Amino acid sequence: MSFVVIIPARYASTRLPGKPLVDINGKPMIVHVLERARESGAERIIVATDHEDVARAVEAAGGEVCMTRADHQSGTERLAEVVEKCAFSDDTVIVNVQGDEPMIPATIIRQVADNLAQRQVGMATLAVPIHNAEEAFNPNAVKVVLDAEGYALYFSRATIPWDRDRFVKDLETVGDNFLRHLGIYGYRAGFIRRYVTWQPSPLEHIEMLEQLRVLWYGEKIHVAVAQEVPGTGVDTPEDLKRVRAEMR
């Protein structure tokens, strides 16, 4: 099954300046992500960036770059610019791999593409079970609730679903009811084109979750349980230290 990986790599970061280029055991982080994408079997891999230094690092590693504007408000908007510049057909399967996930398993990159290709839906993503209370109550861990067919009902930073009977008695155990959303998406290129024509929704502003725009406009997102749990992403200097140790 043919698919394209696009890796948005925005240079500016308030918590970790120049994040795509931070060194992880002798390589820029963006190159590690590029290598994971290559292992997935993608037909084409494009790094979308707004910074020449990132472009040079990717090209030095033999990767393809698409220079994008610096004023995009979301990764999906950056993807849309690449889709137009590369003139992808509407049925092209695009996988958005975050540029700060150097430990993402190649298997789940392909999994999200396969899941999308097997369904008549414009967008697909992945989740993993939550087994501990700390993660269930952490607003930085985005939770997702599914319907009987595996389509998202809602994404939230809140603890959903709220296990009323359990939590009245005990906030230390969470049972088997929670899923943490992973920030990897598969789209058809035509769906990306439609997405960026929609006005941002009130819910996405409240939660700061751009995927809520899709649900707001009545579209479906398929969510599968990931075949592998990805390693730590890099948002902070502490994350970077942890990833360097894990990848040593």
From Swiss-Prot:
Pathway terms, separated by semicolons: Nucleotide-sugar biosynthesis; CMP-3-deoxy-D-manno-octulosonate biosynthesis; CMP-3-deoxy-D-manno-octulosonate from 3-deoxy-D-manno-octulosonate and CTP: step 1/1; Bacterial outer membrane biogenesis; lipopolysaccharide biosynthesis
Any single GO CC term annotated in Swiss-Prot or TrEMBL for this entry: cytosol
Primary localization: cytoplasm
Any single biological process term in GO: CMP-keto-3-deoxy-D-manno-octulosonic acid biosynthetic process
UniProt keyword annotation of Transferase present: yes
Subcellular location: Cytoplasm
GO molecular function, one term: 3-deoxy-manno-octulosonate cytidylyltransferase activity
EC identifiers of the protein: 2.7.7.38
InterPro entries from the UniProt entry: Cytidylyl_trans, KdsB, Nucleotide-diphossugar_trans
Family, per entry: Belongs to the KdsB family.
Role, per record: Activates KDO (a required 8-carbon sugar) for incorporation into bacterial lipopolysaccharide in Gram-negative bacteria.
Name of the protein in its database record: 3-deoxy-manno-octulosonate cytidylyltransferase
Gene (UniProt): kdsB
